[in-house]
Swiss-Prot record:
Amino-acid positions noted as binding a bacteriochlorophyll in the UniProt annotation, renumbered to this chain: H18, H36
Cytoplasmic side: 2-25
UniProt KW Membrane keyword: yes
Cysteines engaged in disulfide bonds, as pairs: none
Organism: Magnetospirillum molischianum
Homology family: Belongs to the antenna complex beta subunit family.
Source taxon at top rank: Bacteria
Coiled coil: none
Protein name per its UniProtKB record: Light-harvesting protein B-800/850 beta 2 chain
Cellular component per GO, a single term: plasma membrane light-harvesting complex
Membrane topology field: Single-pass type II membrane protein
GO terms for biological process, alphabetical: photosynthesis, light reaction
């Protein structure tokens, strides 16, 4: 029987989950930055 990590994922599954997380997190950061810039252009807070 193959050994599994504490998360229950194999090494390959963990790498795939991490890659997907990086992609979605990067998209979130870009979207948040764009939203902040648009709000700042509309109504500067300093």
């Amino acid at each position: 029987m193959a050994e599994r990590s504490l998360s229950g994922l194999t090494e390959e599954e963990a790498v795939a989950v991490h890659a997907q997380f990086q992609t979605t997190f990067s998209a979130f950061i870009v979207l948040a930055a764009v939203a902040h810039v648009l709000v700042w252009v509309w109504k500067p807070w300093f």
